[in-house]
């Protein structure tokens, strides 16, 4: 258990710290722009990471929101209850995950709709001979290649999940442990979320340097950052909202940190 605690402290000190939280939106924007320019001006040679069948893409990125939701659900429950002692406040905070799910659903479907209305079906990726098909599904069913404006869903969701995790894990610095199992459970969840952030940042970088064009990646990243800004920087500050994590709320209101 000591190793787990040391690991959690290391992640808190080196990765999920206040400086990283504050500068992460700028970092993501730089990765999206820098990686896109690298892809356009000096493409990297093929590697394991531009193979869509790589293990992180197949087992993690494909289920990006599921992994984020699955790990944040118990973390928010335990940490928010320890800081507030109120089941009502915990349920209110958990509703932020429903809001995140709604943003994920709406944006994903919007991207698919844009790709549909801007796309056409072709016989191959060379985009030489077009085929008459109504939509992407029908096109692919008949062996065609659908080409439209494909906003990067990876850039959107990875950036959004990274920023959400950073917001929700900010409570870790405010918790004082009295019980061993509290420390063990929360440290384990915090460590898992820290590893997940590292995976998401790495795969965001891989997407930036290997896939899509610059406009598709920048727009996808902008949607992810906008969804985060609308919620955590504006709406969650309002009385009728899921609210900010307890540490963030008390910090912004200049109140003493919650203790249990």
Curated annotation (Swiss-Prot):
Transmembrane spans: 24-44, 58-78, 94-114, 145-165, 190-210, 211-231
All ranges on the Lumenal side of the membrane: 45-57, 115-144
Cell location: Endoplasmic reticulum membrane
First-level EC class: hydrolase
Keywords from the UniProt entry: Endoplasmic reticulum, Hydrolase, Lipid metabolism, Membrane, Transmembrane, Transmembrane helix
GO CC annotations on file: endoplasmic reticulum membrane
Alphabetical list of InterPro entries matching this protein: FIT, FITM1/2
Principal cellular location given in the protein's record: endoplasmic reticulum
Topology feature Cytoplasmic, residues: 1-23, 79-93, 166-189, 232-260
Pfam families (alphabetical): FIT
Isomerase among keywords: no
Chloroplast in keyword set: no
MF terms (GO), sorted A to Z: coenzyme A diphosphatase activity; diacylglycerol binding; triglyceride binding
EC code: 3.6.1.-
Topology relative to the membrane: Multi-pass membrane protein
Active site: 154, 212
Catalytic activity, reaction form: an acyl-CoA + H2O = an acyl-4'-phosphopantetheine + adenosine 3',5'-bisphosphate + 2 H(+)
GO biological process, one term: fatty-acyl-CoA catabolic process
HAMAP family: FITM2
Entry's family note: Belongs to the FIT family. FIT2 subfamily.
Function summary: Fatty acyl-coenzyme A (CoA) diphosphatase that hydrolyzes fatty acyl-CoA to yield acyl-4'-phosphopantetheine and adenosine 3',5'-bisphosphate. Preferentially hydrolyzes unsaturated long-chain acyl-CoA substrates in the endoplasmic reticulum (ER) lumen. This catalytic activity is required for maintaining ER structure and for lipid droplets (LDs) biogenesis, which are lipid storage organelles involved in maintaining lipid and energy homeostasis. May directly bind to diacylglycerol (DAGs) and triacylglycerol, which is also important for LD biogenesis.
Name this polypeptide is given: Acyl-coenzyme A diphosphatase FITM2
Organism: Xenopus laevis (African clawed frog)
Lineage: Eukaryota, Metazoa, Chordata, Craniata, Vertebrata
């Amino acid at each position: 258990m000591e190793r787990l605690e040391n690991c959690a402290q290391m992640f808190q000190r080196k990765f999920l710290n206040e400086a990283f939280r504050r500068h992460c939106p700028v970092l993501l924007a730089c990765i999206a722009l820098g990686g896109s320019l690298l892809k356009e001006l000096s493409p990297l040679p093929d590697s394991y990471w531009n193979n869509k069948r790589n293990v992180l893409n197949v087992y993690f990125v494909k289920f990006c929101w599921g992994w984020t939701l699955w790990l944040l659900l118990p973390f928010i429950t335990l940490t928010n209850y320890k800081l507030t002692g109120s089941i009502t406040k915990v349920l209110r905070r958990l509703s932020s995950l429903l809001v995140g799910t709604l943003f994920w659903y709406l944006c994903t479907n919007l991207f698919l709709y844009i790709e549909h209305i801007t796309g056409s079906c072709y016989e191959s990726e060379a985009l030489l001979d077009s085929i008459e098909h109504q939509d992407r599904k029908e096109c692919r069913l008949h062996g065609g290649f659908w080409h439209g404006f494909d906003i990067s869903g990876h850039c959107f969701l990875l950036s959004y999940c990274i920023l959400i995790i950073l917001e929700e894990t900010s409570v870790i610095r405010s918790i004082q442990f009295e019980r061993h199992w509290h420390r063990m459970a929360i440290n384990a969840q915090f460590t898992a979320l820290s590893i997940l952030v590292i995976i998401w940042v790495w795969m965001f970088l891989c997407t930036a340097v290997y896939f899509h064009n610059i406009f598709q990646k920048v727009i996808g990243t902008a949607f992810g950052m906008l969804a985060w800004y609308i919620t955590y920087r504006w709406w969650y500050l309002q009385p009728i909202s899921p609210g900010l994590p307890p540490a963030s709320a008390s910090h912004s209101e200049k109140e003493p940190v919650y203790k249990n």
